[in-house]
């Protein structure tokens, strides 16, 4: 029994390109398939299975909090996902409930396809169920067995793609997005961009921390300067006073040294005078002795007394000096 493929929520932006790639070999326009439509109407359990599978896929592919990659196109995808869900729940169900009019009014199918087309194009997405239903309607009844085989292969292929989607779904999205004109980011490129942003943010944080540390050091140094500047000024004043005292002491030392030189010269002069007076005294004593001897020889007694008195006076003068 023919079954339509399940929905893949994460590939909503690439259904036009996906349908053109997967269904192009066997989507040749032919007569409407009445038998396929009647079998689809007679199987209402397929709809429940489709809804359960779509709900489970939507629950499995939600991005968790721990994911480190956040795509920049997430708001647009979320809006398109809501529109795609509303199309599946309301219009897609109404399309299958109206398939009982295929025998009576074949033109009604074209009208319904025309009505469903703008709704899908409003969100820039086309469901695989709609395109596959159109292909089933266009195939002749003679190709019913081949259609069933193609449906089974298509379901297996879609399910395998759904299983492989968490691992390499982004690469297939990039390949199909380039052909359909939609721009999808590569996860490696996203990681590289995020790493660059994080490194830039860390560098900015380090620069800000370094600047704040420099500002704190500058403020601390300014506070120390403001505290030590009065003490430095006081020490400068004391140094000036000490320099003045030092200069005065130097001048006094110079004066004292000059006085010492004068005193030394005066002492030398006095010593020379003492030597001269001693020599004079010795000469006078010798002359007096000679005179005394001469007088003693002549017999004059008064003159020796005078000579003795003069010699005593000279000795006193020498002792005083």
Curated annotation (Swiss-Prot):
Coiled coil: none annotated. One of its GO terms (biological process) is positive regulation of DNA-templated transcription. Expressed in vascular tissues of leaves, stems and siliques, anthers, filaments, tapetum, mature pollen grains, pistil vascular tissues and papillar cells, and funiculi. Residues 110-133, 145-155, 172-182 have a biased composition (Low complexity). Disruption phenotype: Pollen morphological defects, reduced pollen germination efficiency and pollen tube growth. GO terms for molecular function: DNA binding; DNA-binding transcription factor activity. Transmembrane segments: none annotated. Residues 97-189 are annotated as: Disordered. It is found in: Nucleus. Residues 188-207 are annotated as: Basic motif. Residues 186-238 form the bZIP domain. Gene3D superfamilies: 1.20.5.170. Residues 214-235 are annotated as: Leucine-zipper. Its main location: nucleus. Transcriptional activator involved in the sporophytic control of cell wall patterning and gametophytic control of pollen development. May play a role in the control of metabolic pathways regulating cellular transport and lipid metabolism. This is Basic leucine zipper 34. The gene is BZIP34.
